[in-house]
């Protein structure tokens, strides 16, 4: 399988997995027109859509795509049924698309019904984990998002994090501001700055790298917490997650 991405809106990525025959899977098609163009340019034939959550920038293109390709199958969590999901997935459910086995699992936080999909090495995690960051908590709690991160962190280290937005640089600006002396962070910040200056994408990320630079995955490290905010030393990882996300919201 080959991984590609289609830019949409200001910073969205619509992910595409295609086989050698040109059949493809689309993830979170928030708008249809850029997808139509990419399908024509690459001679792809879509057979399935995966939806991670109900927000319009992830589901807005579904209706038009199904109208043009009526044989397409749309998978998604219960909250996406009204957005066009035909097959509602359950936590821990496995299914096959284009010969690949996918695991659907619940990752609440950004929304209450958010799901992610894993087919090694690809993780399509929508707006749960971003490179060097996490999604805003529009519906869920910090504790829920923390547990979602724990599920993702249990995947193999060479998992490719295919998140839905190009937020890496803004996430790193925040992390470097609160932890300026971390060598892994500062090095990655320089690399990402160079990529974005050339209008190149920073995704997918790799879980092994995220374990080094994504502070939301390092909240059980007491030495790290001492550097960020010693007042959090006796707090739980969930409380630390809430504090860090709140600081980012107001950065």
Swiss-Prot record:
SUPFAM superfamilies in the record, alphabetically? Answer: Metallo-hydrolase/oxidoreductase
- Binding-site residues for Zn(2+) 1, renumbered to this chain: 53, 55, 110, 127
Please share the entry's free-text remark on the cofactor.
Binds 2 Zn(2+) ions per subunit.
- InterPro entries listed in its UniProt record: Clx_II_MBL, Glyoxalase_II_hydrolase, HAGH_C, Hydroxyacylglutathione_Hdrlase, Metallo-B-lactamas, RibonucZ/Hydroxyglut_hydro
Q: Name one Pfam family in it.
A: HAGH_C
> Subunit info?
Monomer.
What this chain does, per the record? Thiolesterase that catalyzes the hydrolysis of S-D-lactoyl-glutathione to form glutathione and D-lactic acid.
* Name of this protein: Hydroxyacylglutathione hydrolase
Which gene is annotated as encoding this protein in its UniProt record? gloB
